[in-house]
């Protein structure tokens, strides 16, 4: 069982306890800090919708430290980021791999950041299926459709030619923050909050 720190704050009615993630949510900070799967994706989507309802004009900050995961779960988060009214700034801490890298580059243009020693990785989707030959063929065709979709999304957000994206994603493609910036996955590399505040002006 993982331990989640509790923050205790004084209020006019006594003390109030929050888990650390709920407290950060009050500051409009969302953490994507594990494998992307359906349950966590639903929680992230709910947080995005809640923050939009609370203030549709105020920016949201998404911190990403994820090895990636299920494509459909990641696309649920991605689509919600594009759907809501607030701008979503993204920041890679540690790693943003596979679907994590799509969420990173899917942030608001000019507000996609990486810390200096993060790693970013893109690649084509993978899948495995057992069953009848016809069913295997159906799933293979679906995987190819998803591959084309992801290539188009990366092309859109990096502003690179689709052919270059396809070639770059054929195998696991690890990048430093500098390489990710050159590729178009992030806009800036930041080493301190002061730098981020300066860039936001």
Swiss-Prot record:
UniProt superkingdom: Bacteria
Catalytic center residues: 98, 123
Molecular functions per Gene Ontology: ATP-dependent peptidase activity; ATPase binding; serine-type endopeptidase activity
Keyword Cytoplasm tagged: yes
Subcellular location: Cytoplasm
UniProt keywords, alphabetically: Cytoplasm, Hydrolase, Protease, Serine protease
Reaction catalyzed: Hydrolysis of proteins to small peptides in the presence of ATP and magnesium. alpha-casein is the usual test substrate. In the absence of ATP, only oligopeptides shorter than five residues are hydrolyzed (such as succinyl-Leu-Tyr-|-NHMec, and Leu-Tyr-Leu-|-Tyr-Trp, in which cleavage of the -Tyr-|-Leu- and -Tyr-|-Trp bonds also occurs)
Enzyme class: hydrolase
EC number: 3.4.21.92
Record flagged with keyword Protease: yes
Primary location recorded for the protein, binned into one broad class: cytoplasm
Quaternary structure, from the entry: Fourteen ClpP subunits assemble into 2 heptameric rings which stack back to back to give a disk-like structure with a central cavity, resembling the structure of eukaryotic proteasomes.
Chain's role: Cleaves peptides in various proteins in a process that requires ATP hydrolysis. Has a chymotrypsin-like activity. Plays a major role in the degradation of misfolded proteins.
Name by which UniProt lists this protein: ATP-dependent Clp protease proteolytic subunit
Source species: Rickettsia rickettsii (strain Sheila Smith)
